[in-house]
Amino acid sequence: MNQIDWTEKIAIVTGGGGGMGQAAAKRFADAGARTFVFGRTLESLRETAALSPNIVPVVCDVADPASVAEAMKVVREAGPPFVLIHTAGVNTPDRFLAHADPSKEASAETWKKVMEINVLGVVHMLQAVSGPMAEAGGGRIVVVSSTAGHGFDSFAGVPYTASKWAVHGLLFTARAQLSAHGIALSEYAPGESNTPIVKMRPVQPTPEHKAAMIQTEDCGEALFFMASQAHSMGVIQMPLYQPFGGMPPQIPSPWLPGLEVRMK
């Protein structure tokens, strides 16, 4: 049962140009929230903005604190944000620490990109919204993590998995600090999800594999549910797995050829 009347509430959704960010933005907008979607390019946000008159596109690179500050000025003109849904995140094809094909090993640039967007992006957004939320009496923040950050699997690659472990620790530490200001901080950790990030995989999943993944609409519903609970019964963490309960044996096999640990 939803505990919050979203009419006239202000929501921010990062990574709003597609995937679960787009699904979440539509869900909050349909509930009546004035929904600001953040994304790196206006082109990527136009499709989302066309879904509802309640959706406002705002160009923002969460890895850049100056860009976040400018985007927040647009939001603050409408009022204080009540909810932040942070879905922005990336992965890359070069994701291994050791591999027979050196081109598949994560470069220094890849490490920097993944950490800046996946980890510092969370930091920048938490810092940007926590002050206005506290001044307004509280709010809701739901950050998308991953089961990769909970020890579920390592097939997402080394940089991505490390970044999600970092996010998990960040949220665990920040939760009590924000709660003291009336801000409920939750972590949504889905397993394999059929989002645009799948395109970064070295081996593309089959249609059957994609159908078995968590779908973006389901992610949008889960994020809305988590943000809609009363502060007294907020959802701290929600790991979400596929119906089959994990990655079946036939799925990891394409990743294994060529994988090796080089000791020299």
Where are each of the predicted segments found?
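The beta1-alpha1 cofactor-binding region of Rossmann-like NAD(H)/NADP(H)-dependent oxidoreductases
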Residues: 60-70, 108
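C-terminal helical subdomain
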Residues: 180, 187-188, 203-259
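Conserved glycine-rich cofactor-binding loop
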Residues: 17-18
